[in-house]
Design a protein with these regions (language model features):
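Secondary-structure transition/capping motifs at alpha-helix termini
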Residues: 105-113, 134-144, 168, 172-177, ...
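Long, charged, mostly alpha-helical binding arms that flank functional sites
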Residues: 40, 125, 133, 141, ...
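Short Cys/His-rich metal-coordination motifs, predominantly Zn2+-binding knuckles/fingers
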Residues: 220, 310, 409-410, 480-482, ...
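C-terminal low-complexity, glycine/proline- and small-hydrophobic-enriched intrinsically disordered tails
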Residues: 702, 809-909
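N-terminal, positively charged nucleic-acid-binding surface of large information/translation enzymes
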Residues: 2-3, 11, 22, 29-293, ...
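Flexible, glycine/threonine-enriched loop-and-boundary segments that flank and lead into catalytic domains
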Residues: 232, 236-266, 270-271, 460-462, ...
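Structured ligand/cofactor/substrate-binding pocket environments in proteins
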Residues: 92-104, 120-121, 190-193, 210-211, ...
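Glycine-rich (often Gly-Gly/Gly-Pro-rich) flexible segments and glycine-rich loop motifs
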Residues: 476, 481-526, 635-662
Length: 909
């Protein structure tokens, strides 16, 4: 019964480490070889992967409550970073899903109750931009023509029509998410949480209003976050397309301008030459700065120069923090440059704004000839006017410069001084830093700890307001009483009534009495809610408080520390966060700050960060470069014409579209082959060994496709010979198998059998150790090597000789009987397919859920035992065996001889 015992042992091992169902339950399903896929002549991802997701969902396999012994099972919780509801699945999403799904399935394999929560982000700027462009294209109207509420209604219409697109694409990748907990960051529960959190922070004195320098998008007429700013390096003269201009705009050029000195010293310089890349901002110049270490300008501090355009005098000041000695000078424009603004603050200089929110020159009598002109029109006119005054000394290429561009609109960022709402971050940042330093939160890879510490110790207050219509409107109200007494207050509240009451409570007793008397005399109270909305990172930073709030009473506040502590572990709200390292500050750090402030415990105990995905040449993926790899095109296949049509449906300029389509034809002349989701997932897991950045190539996907094909053919080979292997679907009794294995007699195992089983156990050990340490590339590589080298290229080929009767006497002595090889194939595939199912999702899903057991063979006779003993002795005694056989094989053969001899001796008694 040795073959049956080994078969049951390995099946038991599979049940323990793999679990026959993805939800962590052991069961036996219909026979694999009766399914239609068995009739395929070759591997087809489209057919193999079809219908599995609906089958999984119908049986609730991703529901953490349906795991065996759910009430006592260890809990594992994880949040999927919410993709934008406006978007489609991009390769970064696919990487995140592949990693998180492998982690989720592995934890289910170990019997844990896995709660992997999905959702979508309302994508403030992105969503508003998409709907605005659609509105203008279809009706010729702007959002201002519709009005705020009507436009928001249009956004909701778009969301209801198109919002499920990315959800369906996520399912096509096989992500085993708990859709019962799905959220949208503008749904009522989340909106209430965001509102409550803001009011609490405001009342605690952590949110304030201030005028500071911000990154302003004139096209969007809103502040944008740093992650939405693309830094474009230039070397020399560079032409860049800018929205609203017919011709490209020139950048990377230094314009030289002469400023005459007022009352120059005898034998001293008569003027100071200044170089600037932004002559259009000269209208706001308030001073000329020089470096005190520059001998050329000694004695000029305290003097004045004449502004060549405005005919007014501006002072010369020393500022070594601002002026680079290599340049020697610099004009100060505080309203449109962060460094200049800091200089103005140090020296008490006036701030003169040049451009308004729309990017046009403001109404100012000092430069009336420029009022209403765009930045680029102003640049041309300034240069022309400087030439007329002979103050323009020409231009030269700047060696290097950086142009800041809005990633959402393509517009050039304009630094502007704007009143905004800010969150004080110093104390919360220190808490978040301490959590990592003390080990309460682990960062993987560990090198990110230094980056985390550096950013959190230097972080500035967070601008949380945006000048949009779509988003969480900021719950702050401007309360004003006008009459004989003027009262002007900002308060955070849930309604106008509450705002008025909170404003009254802020007044002193004397102010209240005076206000009461003036109210009788006709004082009017106006309460107006701020027009701005919150940064989307603020709302997404609160997600763990919503997703993992375990309060039994839904009316309990998600911000209550006692409520939050009812989660799976009082150490954190969830178990793991896996996301891209590019948003470690924008999302991960801010989420840690906000959630810990409210819950008094961190939002997660482990943060796993993956690198950015770039193209094969290491370039950032961009539609204009034609190097974007759409996961759905990789999964389903796409002809070149389809890839190019996708570009045409976007919002690229004519030049960008031309370049993009040309690059597509160059890189993918035959389009994309249909590789399937499993090949893509497996590739992305293997690519995570690239720790700095992932250089994505279709060659890697093609290799994984061949891996899936080889795996498929292995299953097909086994089941094509099901009759010879006597496969059936009896339930596996794990406990009895363990006992049987303790008494195993391996007389029928061969050298090759034992070698393969040894490598199987080695692979399983490597796989589980790697998964436990979140080294997914190592786990995937261990599986790949075992399948391709050990199982397919070696053992299966030997088994074919055995099945088809092509062995000579020596080979049969080494390989043993057909029964032995047949048993070991089934035993090895059983735990292996379950491991692969955790990594790929579908190609091994059916075998993983239906892997069968083999009927027991008949008892060996004494004659057969003696014959087997002689065969083993002849092999073990050969010179070649003693020279080349691995020690583990020799040790096993020695035990085998001893067991055979003992069995024969017992039989003779």
């Amino acid at each position: 019964m040795a073959s049956q015992t080994l078969l049951r042992y390995v099946a038991s091992s599979a049940a323990k480490t793999g679990r026959l169902c993805l939800a962590g339950r052991t069961s036996t399903l219909r026979q694999w070889y009766t399914a239609p896929v068995h009739k395929l002549d070759k591997y087809s991802p489209e057919i193999v992967e079809s219908d599995w997701y609906s089958w999984w969902q119908q049986r609730g396999l991703f529901d953490p409550k349906k795991v065996d012994n759910a009430s006592n099972a260890d809990e594992f919780s994880m949040l999927l970073p919410p993709p934008n509801v406006t978007g489609v699945l991009h390769i970064g999403h696919a990487l995140t899903l592949s990693i998180q799904d492998a982690i989720a399935r592995w934890n289910r394999m170990h019997g844990r109750s896995v709660n992997w929560v999905p959702g979508t982000d309302h994508a403030g700027i992105s969503m508003q931009t998409v709907v605005e462009k659609k509105l203008e294209r279809e009706t010729g109207k702007t959002r201002h023509d519709l009005g705020r509420q009507a436009f928001i209604d249009k956004v909701w219409e778009w969301k209801h029509e198109h919002g499920d697109r990315i959800k369906q694409q996520t399912k096509s990748l096989g992500a085993s998410l708990n859709w019962n907990e799905e959220y949208f960051t503008m749904d009522p529960r989340h909106s209430q949480l965001v509102r409550d959190a803001f009011i609490r922070l405001y009342d605690d004195g952590l949110i304030y209003r201030s005028t500071k320098m911000v990154s302003w998008s004139c096209a969007l007429q809103s502040v944008i976050s740093d992650i939405e700013v693309d830094k474009i390096p230039t070397e020399g003269r560079t032409l860049i397309e800018v929205p609203g201009t017919k011709a490209k705009v020139e950048f990377g050029v230094l314009h030289m301008v002469e400023f005459p000195i007022v009352d120059p010293a005898p034998h001293g310089p008569l003027s100071v030459r200044v170089e600037t890349t932004r002559p259009e901002t000269m209208l706001g110049d308030v001073a000329l700065a020089i470096c005190s270490r520059d001998d050329r300008y000694k004695g000029l501090e305290g003097k004045y120069v004449v502004h060549p355009l405005l005919a007014r005098e501006i002072p010369i000041i020393h500022d070594d923090d601002l002026v680079n000695p290599e340049f020697g000078t610099g004009v100060i424009t505080p309203a449109h440059d962060e460094n200049d603004y800091a200089c103005a603050q140090r020296h008490g200089l006036l701030v003169v704004p040049v451009f308004g929110p729309a990017g046009t020159v403001v109404d100012n009598p000092h430069f009336s000839d420029y009022i209403g002109k765009s930045r680029w029109e102003t640049r041309r006119k300034v240069i022309s006017d400087l030439k007329d005054t002979s103050a323009y000394l020409g231009s030269r290429d700047a060696e290097t410069s950086v142009v800041s561009k809005c990633s959402r609109s393509g517009d050039i960022i304009e630094p502007m001084l704007m009143p905004q709402w800010y969150l004080r971050c110093s104390e919360m940042a220190k808490t978040a830093d301490d959590l990592v330093q003390r080990g309460n939160v682990s960062l993987i890879p560990k090198r990110q700890q230094a980056t985390w510490h550096s950013w959190l110790t230097e972080t500035e207050d967070w601008c949380v307001s945006r000048q949009l219509w779509w988003g969480h409107r900021i719950p702050v109200y401007h309360v004003r009483w006008e009459g004989s007494i003027a009262v002007d207050l900002w308060v955070a509240a849930t309604s106008e009534e509450q705002a008025r009451a909170k404003a009254l409570n802020k007044l002193s007793a004397g102010e209240k009495d005076l206000l009461a008397s003036t109210t009788e005399g006709g004082a009017v109270c106006t309460v107006t809610q701020d027009e701005d909305v919150l940064d989307t990172w603020f709302s997404s930073g609160l997600l763990p408080l919503l997703a993992f709030n375990h309060a039994s009473n839904s009316k309990m506040s998600s911000l209550d520390p006692d409520t939050c502590a009812q989660g799976p572990s009082k150490a954190s709200l969830s178990t793991v966060l896996e996301t891209g390292q590019d948003i470690i500050f924008f999302w991960v750090a801010r989420m840690t700050m906000l959630c810990t402030y409210f819950a008094q415990i961190p939002p997660f105990s482990t943060v796993l960060l993956h690198p950015m995905v770039r193209d094969a040449q290491g370039r950032k993926m961009s539609k204009s470069l034609g190097n974007v790899i759409d996961p759905m095109d990789v999964i389903n296949g796409a002809e070149l014409s389809k890839l190019q049509d996708t570009l045409r449906r976007g919002y690229l300029s004519g030049q960008e579209l031309k370049r993009g389509t040309k690059e597509l034809a160059k890189m993918y002349p035959n389009g994309f082959q249909q590789f399937g989701a499993d090949a893509l997932r497996f590739t992305l897991l293997l690519y995570t060994q690239q720790t700095q950045q992932i250089n994505m190539s279709l060659d890697g996907v093609r290799a994984s496709y061949h891996f899936c094909n080889k795996l498929w053919n292995t299953f097909r080979f086994i089941h094509m010979h099901a009759d010879k292997l006597e496969i059936h679907t009896d339930h596996v009794d794990q406990n009895s198998n363990k006992q049987w294995f303790a008494d195993i007699n391996d007389r029928e195992l061969t050298v090759f059998d034992r070698a393969l089983l040894s490598r199987l156990h080695g692979m399983l050990h490597t796989y589980h150790s790697a998964m436990e340490a979140y080294r997914l590339a190592a786990a995937a590589e261990a599986v790949r090597v075992f399948v391709q080298r050990d199982l397919c290229d070696r053992y299966i080929e030997i088994c074919k000789l055995s099945l088809f009767g092509n062995q000579n006497a020596t080979n049969q002595a080494i390989s043993g009987s057909n029964d032995s090889s047949d048993n070991v194939i089934t035993m090895v595939v059983s735990p292996h397919v379950r491991v692969v199912a955790r990594l790929t999702g579908k190609v091994a899903a059916q075998p993983a859920q239906t892997t069968s057991t083999r009927k027991a063979t008949s008892a060996a006779t004494m004659a057969k035992l003696e014959s087997e003993l002689e065969k083993v002795r002849s092999v073990v005694g050969s010179a070649g065996y003693q020279r080349s056989a691995p020690d583990i094989v020799k040790e096993a053969d020695t035990k085998r001889l001893e067991m055979l001899e003992a069995k024969i001796a017992a039989g003779r008694k």
